[in-house]
Amino acid sequence: MTMSDDTPNEVNHVDIDFPPKTADDFFRRGLKSAQLGIPDKAAADFEEAAWLAPENHDIQFNLGVAYLSMADFEQAINNFTKAIELKPGVADMYGNRAVAHAAIGEDEQSEVDVAEAVRLGAPPDGLGAVIDYVKEQRK
């Protein structure tokens, strides 16, 4: 058995820097960046992917998550809303949008999304704890 001379970091770096051409390429690179905690780079790749495949709910959802992690709550809401329009009935989409609404003080909209997320299977205690934390951070 032979071992590669590449360290794991070098391998991951190569995987991320390949020249993307398709929506899937940009999406996969965005996921890698998100996993590495680089939300701005993830968002840039997800934006490219969304340009190439605007009707892909996974891209819109992950774009929303990237913006949520960068505290761009209005943009996150826009992307979660688009994801919901493309594929209604996914608890995580409503739950994340609820968090974004709560972060900017839109408590009524947040409560509506929390109720829908819970109806679709989100754990009420977990989502409630996140919403409470976000509201505390607003103060």
Where are the regions a protein language model picked out?
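Alpha-helical tetratricopeptide repeat
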Residues: 1-139
